[in-house]
Every structure is written in structure tokens, then in C-alpha cells.
Amino acid sequence: MKLFYIYPEQIPQGNAREIAILNTFFELSNMCDAKLVLPQSPLNLNEVNEKFALKLKANDILFVRKKILFLKSNKIFNFFLKKIINNYSNKDAIFYTRHLKIAKFLLENKMPDQKVVFEAHECFTLGNKALYDMEKEILQNADFVFSHNSSTLNELKKFFGLQIANSAVVYNGCKQDSDFKKKDFDFSSINYYGSFLLWKGLDLMLDFALKTNIKLELYGKNSGNSFMTLKNTLKEREIENLVCFKGLLPQNEVVKSLIENNTILIIPSVKSDYSLYSTPLKLFEYMANSNVVLAPNFPPVAEIVKDGENGFLYEAGDEKSLEEKFNYIKTLSNEELNKISKNAYESMSENTWKNRAIKIIKELEKIN
């Protein structure tokens, strides 16, 4: 099986999408003849491997020009991508992407025996109605569609009125390289890893901290507009004393920190049009490293977190529900909490990046 994973963005950026793509591709490259197709740009592969704890090889990456002189364009990228498509040695290759416009280009330019596989993580049309026809065409005509949760696949079927028969769910993955670690859980503070954008749910965490007088230790980028907005908000609400900024951790250090963490890990989130699609990557990372997670009860999240079994759920966007569930968790014994965290750890053993790649390969073999 020959596979080209098309990712038309420069790396590394460190966002969740990139983490998922690089880890998935790396595991796929260990199982089949796979190439990661990237825009041509300076790339320190050793740095990328160190940052993401990977072992990507230089000959697994194909660079495609996206820039000529001072002109940078996706059309340039597509022009050179077409050379890969038209190469006769790739006449029966599989082209895999999460990028909507790349998927459209592949469908329009592929050879008869080539296959186009699209991985869906959202409904792009929710943010841009002009994409409706393109997105429907891709979901209808792609040779196979993967979705990162059942809720997303079902919502896309309903939204576009499609069956999407050639499809499967492959949940996001995680690294799980250490044994389960029993912990002495502490409720005096809460660690938070991720974006400092208030609208993504951090605002809910601030309300929770103000109400409970609990300290927050925030791991994230200590610069930029979102950081400054957060700093100003803390000052306005007079809760600066409750928040400690710990800085941005490299991805390989995040896992170490999560293994050592002994606080309840809350995923703050508010309801939006995207609530039926989103499963945060951090959810998998938290659960894979012996933690107790308190997450919003969105349908995609509830596919992973079974309330009271391998984690806990609260009513999304409801500060009162969050506080009540947190207070309930505090009543549990340390032994009971370790049982919950062990269940979380064990449930993630099925969702390693390697197992994700195995599931993808199994489905692709059916169409190859």
C-alpha cells in the first residue's frame, strides 16, 4: 500500500491538529509505504522529532513548493502536488488529508485507480456557508471518510443528508509509554494545560476559581493577545492572586508533567455550534497518564468519558454544575479516585497512536 498524507501547512506549530497528524503519520509510516507531503520550507527534523517525541525519517517526507519568488499560494502547492498525482508509479496510491480544499483538488485530479481519503473533524460549513457544496461533494465522493468520533460522523450525515457508507470512526490518539501511576490527589489547586482564549472555556475556569477560591496553575504561551487579555481580565476580577503562569511546555514535557500531576484536571468548555463535533486532544492525554478528568458532557466527550467510571462529566458551560461535581469528587477517597484514574488509563490503551494507525490501515485495505 502506497499512501501520501497531504498536510499543506508549515511545521512545527505545536497545535493539536499538528500533534495528531504527525503522530498518526509516524505510526502509518511504520506499517506501509507512506509519505508526508508538506510545503517546502526550512525544517529541522531533529527539532521536530525531539519536540514531539517521534522518529520521523527524512525520506518519509516530500516537500512541495508553495512559493515562487515572493509569491506564496495554495495554487502553487497544488500545481506541484499534481506532479505527484500524475506520476505513473503512484497510479494506485491512496491520498489522505484533513484539508477540505486539498480533498477537493485530489478528487478533481486523481487517476482512476487512485483513492482519496478524507478525515473529518468538524463541519466546515458551520463557519462558512459558502463551503456547503464543496464539503458535501467531498463527503459524498471520497473513497473513504474517517471521523474522529461517532457524533461528528452522525451530525455530518444529518447536516448534508448523506449516508457516507464508506466510513469509520477512529478516535484521536495518545502516547502511553509509562505504567499506571497511583497518586495522592490534591484539591488545593488545579493544573490547566492549553489555550488562554477566554471564549474557549477558560472564562468558566476563572468563574470557578473565584467561587471556590481555588488556585489555578496555567501551562501555556505567556505572550500574545490572548495572554494579555487574560492578564487584564484577572486584574479586573481581582483574582490575580489565584493564578500562577507556569509557561509553555514542549510537547514531550507535557506528558512528563501529566504523569506527575496529582490535581483534578478540568476541561473547561462552553456550548457552541461545534459542541457536537469536538473531542479535545488533551482529554486523551490526560486520561492516558493516570489522571482524574472532569469534562463537559458534550456527546463526543461522553463517548470517551463514562461518568463515575473512568472520569466525570459536568453540564457544559454551567459553572454551578462544575462546582457541584468537583465538590462531589472531593468526597471520594483517594483509593476510589485511583480506581477512576486507573480505569481512564486502561481505557486509553486502545487509543494509542499505534492502535489508531492499525485501525486506519485495516479500513484502507478494504478499498486498496
Model-derived regions: residue spans:
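N-terminal strand-loop element at the rim of the active site
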Residues: 7-14, 27-76, 152-153, 157, ...
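A short, active-site helix/loop in glycosyltransferases that binds the activated sugar's phosphate group
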Residues: 105-106, 136-166, 174-178, 360
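Conserved acidic donor-binding segment of nucleotide-sugar-dependent glycosyltransferases
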Residues: 307-308, 312-319, 328-334
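Membrane-proximal helix-turn-helix segments that form the acceptor-binding/catalytic region
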Residues: 23-26, 82-89, 104, 118, ...
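Conserved donor-binding/catalytic core segment of Leloir-type glycosyltransferases
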Residues: 4-6, 146, 181-217
